[in-house]
Amino acid sequence: GSGRTDAGVHALAQVAHGDVPESIGMSGEAWANALNACLPLTIRVTQAEEVHPQFHARFDASGKVYRYRIWRPRMLSPFEADRAWHLYGPLDVDALRWCCEKLVGTHNFIRLSANRGDMPEVERRTLPEKTTRTIHSAEVRECGEVLELEFEGDGFLYKMVRLIVGSMIHVARGREPREWFASLLSDPNGKQSNQTA
């Protein structure tokens, strides 16, 4: 696929590729139907088509978008149970918007990501190119009962969005000043954020 998703994350428009011998001779629609017959109902192939042999879903992705949904009323709707984070209580939405403004650009996200274990920690700490990513846009939207945080970037590190959102909420609840969040982006040598959404 074009990327991994953390546990509990839903993917929309996820692109994947596979190498299939031409001798099979199935149309894209036939492939989609065959795959859907084998997949659980929570996963659907909406389109399948032939692509250039050199195409790679992950390396040819032009960008990725994460949308984090926060349900704010006292009682969580059963329809939102595995689709939103339930956070009842006051949140400073202006602080969330301020954090979003700080996110846009290219930053070293070492303090806002986790080590999956696929690279030594010393490498993560000494090679900033391994943990530097570009965020093209970051927005806060109030959609009725739901607050949506949306991030578009060239790619995301392991648990990066969960740590960004958790840290933003920490500021929006008044538990840390806004400058703390800014320092997570500007000072790669500081303490790792442990505020996971």
Region spans (language model):
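Structured-RNA-binding interfaces characteristic of tRNA pseudouridine synthases
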Residues: G1-A197
